[in-house]
Amino acid sequence: MRIAMLTDCYLPRLGGIEVQVADLSARLVARGHEVEVFTLTPGAVGFGQTETLDGIRVHRLGVRLPRQLLVNPLATRGLRAQLEGFDVAHIHMGVVSPFASDCGFVTSRMGLPTTMTWHCVLDKAESAVRAAGIVRRWAQSGMAMNAVSDVAATPLRRIVDGPPVTVLPNGIDVDAWRPTSGRPLLGDGVVRFVSAMRLEARKRPVQLVEAMAKVRAAAPRAGVRLEILGEGSERAKVERTVDRLGAKDWVSLPGRVPRDTLKERYAASDVFVSPSVLESFGIAALEARVAGLPVVGRVGSGISEFVTDDVNGFLANDDEELVRRLTTLAVHPSVRSRMTAYNLKTDPAQGWDQVVQAAEAEYARARALAG
């Protein structure tokens, strides 16, 4: 099958959508499909060129703009001709995805079978998307809609008003994230909490530092430490919060790290924390769960796809409960051990084999809907 991946963001940029689209493309190629990526993100060849990256043809359709903005209203000129001969298009939508949206118009006018994956929780944008009516028309005219979690799919179902919206989750290489020799017992009296996120307001890194300060106050003997891995526009605000709370000796902000380093940091930690309320999926949390860490997050976020409360982590209704749950893990090593044992012996449902099969089913659904 010839599959066109259509996405605003792609490698070498690093983020949830970028990495997931690249990994899914590679897995599909390994199963015998032909995949090409169309994106606004520049690569080694710059803008307006085509390159082969990890065996996949990548068409770079962006233009050079200040602050590396990924906007090009002319990107879809000629796209229809480029998409001729493909069997299906797979559009990847984020909170703001002008290119992906333009691609929706192109593929619908072509009659090209199309599936659209929503990688975001619409939240306040739901009313605007509903009022525009475009997504509903796409779905009702045969575009196969899905989202990365049931949390992300729920507002989309209200918007499309009838056509089914399925779940196509993010995938993970379970073997790659499993510890090869079990988890080390550090035994130094320190409880290490870790999080990996973009330092953006939507991810709530400031609230995480504030919550952990309350955990330290509630469990002064636990030796609580916090490490937040990632970069973003909120770094300065997070650093000011650390200074205000006098937390420099127990909070570290190493920045963005590669996957191998992330695995090492998880191996040296005890608990993963995901404070975001608007988390559509939470791939970093899933990686930590596969690595054996108990995962603590908020009810109503995407991590509920792979975290069961009081089984392999905790799901809190609000920040006060989040503090209580984190405190429980800080002072009760037996609870941490129980959850870690479960996570190490129980594979999640989001392994790549299952996810690729689900993607293929979506492509078949799109082709059937297109007639």
Task: Describe each PLM feature range.
Residues 151, 171:
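Carbohydrate-associated surface elements
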Residues 309-320, 328-334:
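Conserved acidic donor-binding segment of nucleotide-sugar-dependent glycosyltransferases
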Residues 185-212, 227:
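Conserved donor-binding/catalytic core segment of Leloir-type glycosyltransferases
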Residues 239-257:
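Nucleotide-activated donor-binding/catalytic signature segment of Leloir-type glycosyltransferases, i.e.
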Residues 335-349:
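A short, well-ordered alpha-helix in the C-terminal region of glycosyltransferases
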Residues 83, 256-257, 264-269:
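Short alpha-helical donor nucleotide-sugar binding micro-motif in glycosyltransferases
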Residues 277:
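Aromatic "clamp/platform" in nucleotide-sugar-dependent glycosyltransferases that forms part
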